[in-house]
Regions:
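Noncatalytic, beta-rich nucleic-acid-contacting surfaces in large DNA/RNA-processing enzymes
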Residues: 1-514
Length: 514
């Protein structure tokens, strides 16, 4: 089957449909008469996507995203795909890549935030009253450039969802599709009666790593020949693969919404008490109590629960959302913190002077008036862990790039895309909100998925006030808090102790039956 035929099978008139979806959502956010910076970015992306012939590949993800959001959960797209404004408007990314700005949901008044600090994001700024209607304007925008990060032909998407079955059902219903179960993959055949309806058990669904929209012509029979090499399918013109992972965070946040009645869309990005949790755990307690740990309050907070993240967080002391994004990147990259950024911070460099994201490398050079093409090539060289060339070093010296920054570039092995860090920082923020404001619901929901081991039951039965010494004896906590001998078991024991010290009833089994 020719790609254009397959594109029509997935979505007829995909260019037109994707454009309508994006323009409608942009109009809802920014008014029908789009501000110039919004219109310019959207048009540039849509033209690029249409020219690449991949508009139809956005539609299945849009279908999945709508279904996931209808359940009260969210979808997270991995990698640089999340940087596209089109992805944001389709709902398959929660990251608005535009420059920092305010927009009013009531009258659609929009203001660009005048900042020359390329690392700042909209969430760093306080709420502002709309000069037109007097309503509250919301800050937004993560300042992610477009062209280097949007790839033309994408045979595969990687997403995190609360449940793989939701993805399968959404596509099955929309396309009136049959399904064939393969080895860790479900093949969905649009408009086909050649296969039975999907009825695999939950264990099979959890083990999935791919869902494939496949042309019935490709199959050509009532049962799929699994001898097809994965690479052959991926390079085919008539297959779309969706790599899926069942995300524990999405499941946990869905559970917390059910328990508290507060959804993630109701959580403010301007809560100073939440940012304080990433500096100290004192705010978790109602009295003047000084906690046992002397550490930050991020036990149980994804991406910030382990000692390496603590070490970075304590070194940089985050006080705004962009700081959290950088911490995630420093923790996730290779060769960006130890023997690199950590040393520079100790020497007095600012968090946002050091390398954390690949986009920041390019934006830093652009701020130094380096040509766009040169800035892009240097960024590509650094992010792939390659040392800068002599020509690049001469160019950087000529542009006034300090030697310490050039040396830092050459120490990098792998640096993260900003979209990944933003997505993780947002999840951490949401979880921190629930932990601070709904402690019982947070600890209950968290441990609901962790309490299978008998040690938790033993902890609950034998807990008594001020048992921190017992914990140290159990898992050598003194060494653990020196960042040695740390694992998830130790973390969960500390979390249980924290819950008890905050007055939370540890009898989780009576809270959740079945």
């Amino acid at each position: 089957m020719h790609e254009s035929e397959f594109a029509d099978l997935i979505c007829k008139d995909a260019d037109k449909k994707l454009r309508l979806i994006c323009e409608k959502k942009a109009g809802e956010l920014y008014d029908v008469n789009l501000p110039f910076f919004v219109k310019e970015r959207l048009e540039a992306e849509l033209q690029f996507i249409e020219k690449s012939g991949c508009s139809y590949r956005y539609i299945p993800l849009k279908i999945v995203a709508d279904k996931v959001y209808s359940t009260g959960s969210f979808i997270e797209i991995k990698g640089c795909d999340g940087t596209a404004f089109a992805s944001y408007l389709c709902g398959i990314s929660q990251i608005n890549p535009l420059p920092p700005h305010y927009h009013c949901a009531n009258c659609h008044h929009t203001e660009i935030i005048d900042t020359h600090k390329y690392w700042q994001v909209g969430y760093d700024f306080p709420l502002r009253v709309c000069p037109n209607c007097g309503k509250e304007m919301l800050p937004d925008g993560f300042n992610i450039p477009m062209k280097p990060f949007i790839k033309p032909y994408k045979p595969s998407w990687a997403i995190m969802v609360p449940n793989n079955k939701v993805v399968i059902r959404a596509l099955q219903e929309y396309y009136s599709a049959g399904c064939i179960c393969g080895d860790k993959c479900v093949y969905i055949l649009p408009n086909s009666q050649q296969s039975t309806q999907f009825d695999a058990d939950d264990n099979y669904v959890k083990g999935l790593w791919k869902i494939c929209l496949l042309s019935p012509v490709k199959v050509g029979c009532t049962s799929l020949k699994y001898e097809y090499a994965r690479n052959e399918l991926l390079s085919s013109d008539d297959a779309i693969f969706i790599e899926t992972s069942e995300d524990r965070n999405a499941t946990l946040l869905t559970e917390l919404r059910k328990q508290t009645g507060v959804g993630i869309n109701n959580i403010s990005w301007n809560d100073h008490e939440i940012i304080n949790m990433f500096n100290s755990d004192a705010i978790l307690y109602d009295n003047v109590y000084r906690s046992h740990t002397g550490l930050i309050g991020t036990l149980g907070i994804s991406y910030f629960w382990h000692p390496r993240a603590w070490r970075i967080t304590q070194a940089v002391r985050p006080n705004k959302f962009s700081d959290l994004i950088s911490v995630v990147a420093l923790d996730s990259g290779t060769g960006v913190w130890e023997e690199n950024g950590e040393i520079l911070i100790k020497k007095g460099r600012n968090l946002h002077e050091i390398i954390s994201h690949r986009e920041d490398i390019m934006l830093y050079f652009l701020s130094k008036n380096v040509d766009k093409i040169d800035a892009f090539h240097i960024m590509e060289q650094v992010r792939k862990g390659r040392k800068t060339t002599e020509d690049m070093r001469r160019l950087m010296a000529k542009s006034g790039i300090p030697k310490w920054y050039v040396d830092s570039c050459d120490k990098v092995i792998y640096v993260w895309p900003k979209a990944n860090s933003i997505a993780r920082a947002k999840v951490a923020w949401w979880l921190a909100y629930y932990k601070l404001n709904y402690p019982s619901e947070f600890y209950y929901s968290y441990m609901k998925y962790e309490e299978s081991n008998s040690i938790y039951e033993n902890f609950r039965k034998n807990y008594r006030h001020n048992m921190w010494k017992d914990l140290r004896d159990m898992k050598d906590m003194t060494e653990a808090y020196k960042f040695d001998d740390w694992d998830r078991m130790t973390h969960n024991l500390c979390l249980l102790n924290e819950a008890a010290e905050r007055g939370v009833d540890l009898n989780f089994s009576t809270k959740y039956k079945g």
